[in-house]
Amino acid sequence: MYAKIIQGIQDDVELREELQKIFESKSHKAMVKYSLLLGRHIMDLTNTQPCGEISEAYEISEKWLEGKAKFTEARAAAIKIHRLAHNEEDPVMEKVYRIMVQVAATPHVKNHALIASDYAIKLINTMYPDNAQEVSRERQEQIKLMKSL
């Protein structure tokens, strides 16, 4: 069942439900790996270079996957990126930061991976208003990334 996490997004409900079914079959570690892949995809899509806070979050997530970092470190990294999002005036970059907050927080709670996916759709809605084809393309990419793990 489609659990709407982010309000006010124009989504492809069928593809979102498919993504959620795949999500439910995956481990917490797999979803951390997915979040990192999704974040890289979003940075490529928006031609964004990772700032120090995002790089730190990626390092912590990689260490968490190796059992060398605690989820509290990931949560602290997410809070740093949240501050960037809160102060960002450019609507595209604000969404990129919101996605990265969720990517950074995924070692803390698995569901943050799904929230990052929904924020990515909100980003697509901002970049391509009223464009169902771009939304579907993004959901298909998310499904592909998630299935790869």
Which ranges hold each PLM region?
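Structured binding/interaction patches within domain cores
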Residues: M1-R139, K147-L149
